[in-house]
Amino acid sequence: MKKEEYLEKVALANLWMRAYYEKDEPLASDEEYDVLIRELRVFEEQNKDEISKDSPTQKIAPTIQSEFKKIAHLKRMWSMEDVFDESELRAWAKRAKCEKNFFIEPKFDGASLNLLYENGKLVSGATRGDGEVGEDITLNVFEIENIPKNIAYKERIEIRGEVVILKDDFEKINEKRALLNQSLFANPRNAASGSLRQLDTSITKERNLKFYPWGVGENTLNFTKHSEVMQFIRELGFLKDDFIKLCANLDEVLKAYDELLALREKKPMMMDGMVVRIDDLALCEELGYTVKFPKFMAAFKFPALEKTTRLIGVNLQVGRSGVITPVAVLEPVNLDGVVVKSATLHNFDEIARLDVKINDFVSVIRSGDVIPKITKVFKDRREGLEMEISRPKLCPTCQSELLDEGTLIKCQNIDCEDRLVNSIIHFVSKKCLNIDGLGENIVELLYKHKKITTLESIFHLKFSDFEGLEGFKEKKINNLLNAIEQARECELFRFITALGIEHIGEVAAKKLSLSFGKEWHKQSFEAYANLEGFGEQMALSLCEFTRVNHVRIDEFYKLLNLKIEKLEIKSDGVIFGKTFVITGTLSRPRDEFKALIEKLGGKVSSSVSKKTDYVLFGEEAGSKLIKAKELEVKCIDESAFNELVKE
């Protein structure tokens, strides 16, 4: 890199840094910024006489501008040096002249917070700011339930940590903001930071923030190891993560990194790496600090789950109900080992809310098996070549005129090929008729060759229909035909679910089956609306569907031997009338536990509240278990549950 290019990159890095910290409007993804900073460091290490005093590597990030008063930290809050692979970790350890006894813990992706306690009482809370001075957010800190307001330690002490929003809570916040037509938070970190800096403290309170301590500032503690300090802090009443380790050497650190990385998707909060710190406090003191970082600790970063790429087009998908879903076509980008070429845009209201255009630079996030989504549009990087994404007028599949209902745009042609194919795929899926071997690709193949054209035609398939089709031999054909025959013996609620009625899922289908049996499709609006858990929207949807399809449903009855599950509820057991929430991985499918609880007169809910009686948890239970403990809900594992049902 030449000096001119270096100075250009310094200017770009400063532009991105100011946009992030001062305007709260990022112009690049974290990964792009990290790469740029690393390029600057490489040049500066090789050209020490040409380092610019304006380089972001030479200064702490600026404080976010706000209406909050400033508050000085008693001791500086430092950033951490980032390392990205084994060689960089070993290089850091070599510089620190230490290769043994490391304290490691998750690096949560949230907002740093400094708490000051005097005489055992919480007196202030402040953001990191520039490291020396932060923003006084004390009133908001008092609204965070898991931060102790009083501790059993009378000396003055600063306790530092990370404020996070759990993934489940983040999704709920964005769902609520979408309903209010407010801009969505790009990620849980931005949501946590924004929640801390609210002028209305009630907003902070409702966001359900969590505080995890990671260190201390000013203190008079007399410990020799950082691990002892953290054990003491957590005994004062602070949250402790379950992945905290002492590693004897760097090989153990690398093993711990792999273990934590494997837990990344299962953790209830976002992590972007692992903190590696020398445990010996005397050695830490001896090593000291650079202009920006402590020499005794580093952030061992995870591969990015969020990257910047360009949106180069939009494809339209037609669902089984006719809803048109826009899908962004992206320049391919590698996210944690997966090449991502597309991302959901949800609907055209979301496109308008994002103000995204073709040829825009966008930030894309991928989490586990969740469909990649666009979280940010970098509008300040537009080059004048961007094109509006217009609302479609015609169905991309059948070219019929679309019905524009605002948020949803629908194809009303019931013979539309994509609608039919997706309806059949849903009809035969695991939670519906569960026809083994009749997957998405085979449905598309059979439809293409006109072997199936309606839901009913599945049950008229013959051996000869498969002969000559690629991949079908005698055994496979017979297995599939046998699976179709077995599907004729089907529970009524599965058949109702399979029909794909708008707003009617598995739970509602069970209620219809148990309440009305095979006459479920001949009821009045009032009868539907009066069912527990049903409302006007569901009743209207049922009335409209059954009005059009009641004859067709009767014809299905001739093809299928539908069974009606009769729920015999035991009303004298300890589970009767109790509400359960199930979380984590158990020895058997959750549906089996759910069925048993309902048979014994209990109810299974999807979320934890003060009305929850029991949380049944398995391995790798997440945010629901944390919330249950905070609400003091009784938490039982599988063996305790088995004992309970015996009573």
Swiss-Prot record:
Its EC number is 6.5.1.2. The active site is at 107 (n6-amp-lysine intermediate). GO terms for molecular function: DNA ligase (NAD+) activity; metal ion binding. GO terms for cellular component: cytosol. Signal peptide: none annotated. The keyword NAD applies. One of its GO terms (biological process) is DNA replication. Residues 570-647 form the BRCT domain. It is an enzyme of class 6 (ligase). PROSITE patterns: BRCT, DNA_LIGASE_N1, DNA_LIGASE_N2. NAD(+) binds at residues 30-34, 79-80, 105, 128, 162, 301. The keyword Cell membrane does not apply. Transmembrane segments: none annotated. It catalyses: NAD(+) + (deoxyribonucleotide)n-3'-hydroxyl + 5'-phospho-(deoxyribonucleotide)m = (deoxyribonucleotide)n+m + AMP + beta-nicotinamide D-nucleotide. Gene3D superfamilies: 5' to 3' exonuclease, C-terminal subdomain, BRCT domain, DNA ligase/mRNA capping enzyme, Helix hairpin bin, Nucleic acid-binding proteins. Belongs to the NAD-dependent DNA ligase family. LigA subfamily. This is DNA ligase. It comes from Campylobacter jejuni subsp. jejuni serotype O:23/36 (strain 81-176). The gene is ligA.
